[in-house]
């Protein structure tokens, strides 16, 4: 199995433990989210690139995205509750990642709303991860 798939699956498994059956989970950034699928949690990677830090190793880094989607009418404080009570606590300790990545460093936090269909509001936390193939 591809390392990126294993990373996403490890994070999703931990989030499922923390959130239970109260959300729909996506392996990757969904192209479309139906209102019936909300709340939803998505995990995806972007900007994967070779770092070349060690001459004799295959060092890589990528951005790990974890996002929660809720109904567009909900206030940002509802997104904050999701992040603070479910998402962030789950991300503090993911034992399954220990053999897959070397480091996981918080990078940023973002809010976004669906401008086209007004279906969802999203909060996203990103981490810089480093790993060796």
What do the PLM-derived regions correspond to, one by one?
Residues 38-43:
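A short glycine-rich, His/Asp/Glu-containing loop-to-beta-strand
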């Amino acid at each position: 199995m591809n390392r990126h798939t294993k990373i996403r699956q490890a994070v999703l498994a931990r989030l499922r433990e923390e959130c239970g059956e109260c959300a729909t989970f996506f392996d990757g950034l969904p192209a479309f989210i139906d209102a019936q699928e909300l709340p939803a949690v998505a995990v995806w990677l972007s900007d994967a690139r070779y770092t070349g830090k060690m001459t004799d190793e295959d060092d890589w880094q990528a951005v790990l995205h974890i996002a929660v989607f809720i109904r567009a009418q909900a206030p940002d404080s509802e997104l904050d509750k999701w992040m603070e009570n479910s998402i962030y606590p789950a991300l503090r300790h993911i034992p399954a990642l220990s053999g897959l990545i070397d480091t996981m460093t918080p990078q940023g936090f973002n809010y976004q709303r669906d401008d086209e269909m007004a279906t969802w509001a999203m909060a996203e936390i990103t981490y810089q991860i480093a790993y060796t193939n």
